Amino acid sequence: TPNWDRLVNSGTSFTRAYNMGSWSGAVCVASRHMLNTGRFIWEAEKASQKAEQERESGRFWSEYMKKAGYRTYMTGKWHVRAMAEKCFDVVRNVRGGMPNQTPEGYNRPLSNQPDPWSPYDPKFGGFWKGGKHWSEVVADDALFFLADAKKYQKKKPFFAYVAFNAPHDPRQAPESFINKYPLDRIKVPKSFLPEYPYKNEIKCPHSLRDEKLAPMPRSKHSIKVNRQEYYAIITHMDQQIGKILDGLKESGMEKETYVFFSADHGLGVGHHGLLGKQNLYEHSTRVPFI
């Protein structure tokens, strides 16, 4: 991830940043409401129930920026109950919480059976819906925003909310990015388990979508495949971030722009037998914050 490294080397990386939690299995909903309302989790849930009213009252991040004189932009994942088109001045390609369900991408690979899935075949839709990978669409939108913001540079500063859906499942990336990570070079986590413990106590059943990414019991091979696709979609997203950073530099606005990078939660990706985010292990609650 050379472009994340660019951000770290030119800024500050908070290595102990955590998501406060969630009121449902869709952890991203809670974290994005916390982010956009500035509320702790116990207040963010209340605000989520009346999000449009909160926006109308000016109590959304984007509304505060508008009041401060910023021209506001948004693209990508929203997953907040207030209308993005009303929250921001310019909106392009708002996406839902995740790509459409792609059943072939789950409960795989099965041992001794052909894998029905290809993370780089556009026929499966998902991140490829529309013919262009969603991460590339988001990056292109960000470049459009920079060009538009340049026109207003002397009148208004800009605020851009650029929300990649990656690395949400189904994890898809171009073939060249998959090939960067040969399976024989991928390590299985030291905490690998064929079955995650306390599934009933933590209310994390096998039927949970996140945990259906690989079959039960887990095999080392299936975890390697899962991690290969995770690494690929992350590296592909990093490339798109690089395009945005290059565009910012070319715009001449780099030195007067603050770039913040974070995520809504972590992921298990094979640690402790888990693949998803609905648990309290470090790997699922800690987030990057640069």
Write out the residue ranges for each language-model feature.
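Formylglycine-dependent sulfatase
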Residues: 1-290
